[in-house]
Amino acid sequence: MDSASRSTSSLASSSSSRSGSVADIKMDDNASVDSGFASASSSTSSLPLVSFTHAHLKHLNSQLETMQPMDILRFCKVLFPNLYQTTAFGLTGLVTVDMLSKLQAQTPGMQPTELIFLDTLYHFQETHDLVERVKARYNVPVHIFKPAEVNTTAEFEAMYGEKLYELSSELYDWIAKVEPQQRAYSELNVAAVLTGRRRSQGGQRGDIPVIEIDEERGIVKINPLVNWSFREVKAYVDEHKVPYNALLDQGYKSVGDWHSTVPVGEGEDERAGRWKGQNKTECGIHNKKSRYAEFLQRQEAQKVSA
């Protein structure tokens, strides 16, 4: 059996016991979720913790657009319950961690914003080293979520085969990133998340607002540094001596999995080193959930017909 067949077989055979199984995914895809928007006919018993009308969200974004990131964070800390930061410990996320630490120092009674880190099992060792340095520096809880039922790269490859990221990048993204993220949101009861996305990163991020609603997942996403350039982010890191990934001193600018990240050349975009030569700009966690539900429904059909 080749690696691609083995990975599909493993997914099907473990679906009955795994959190976020194929059957669960199908049910989740068909179930209704709170979008974060409220209408005049909404029942108060069914409203999510945070709800907006479209007009209210538009107004908030118009006001936040001109605010500094620290002020956006201060505002969001007050407005959103169950607020977390999801991060791969890139520069923008690290700036956010540092700013939140400063806000915490100003208001000691304020609940700290805890971090969510998706350990794909294919991160660089330098990234794992950075996680430990951030935990030591900022004394902030880091919730680490790995692919279901595996703890090491060897276990992952025994279940799904070697180089799944090459054989089926969509399946890899689901198993290593999207499902663990979904599990994190559910287990931690996340209502809103801070992200490290910025418009200057280009691609699908070129026109994102400060606050957006992920209607499929039923959460609010906040992009506090949306207006900053890479130069501004790096200047903050240098000025405030924020710990950063050692790979940035070796020509990297955006760091993901080791199998899909390379240094960038002079004048290349910040994220040019991610998925080099592929028609891809996002790892999956910011793509629509339905994109993966459709894929997994095909896997379920294959399992039934087998």
Per-range role (PLM):
Residues D2-A306:
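Nucleotide-activated chemistry modules centered on ATP-dependent adenylation/adenylyltransferase
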